[in-house]
Amino acid sequence: CCSQDCRVCIPCCPY
């Protein structure tokens, strides 16, 4: 999962 804010998503996009 990955939104505009990666830190909000866990786990975050590796790239």
UniProtKB/Swiss-Prot annotation:
Q: Name one GO molecular function term.
A: toxin activity
Q: Which domain of life is it from?
A: Eukaryota
Cell membrane listed as a keyword: no
Q: According to its UniProt entry, what is the function of this protein?
A: May act as a neurotoxin.
Q: Which family does it belong to?
A: Belongs to the conotoxin M superfamily.
Comment on protein domains: The cysteine framework is III (CC-C-C-CC).
Tell me the protein's name.
Conotoxin Fi3a
Identify the species of origin: Conus figulinus
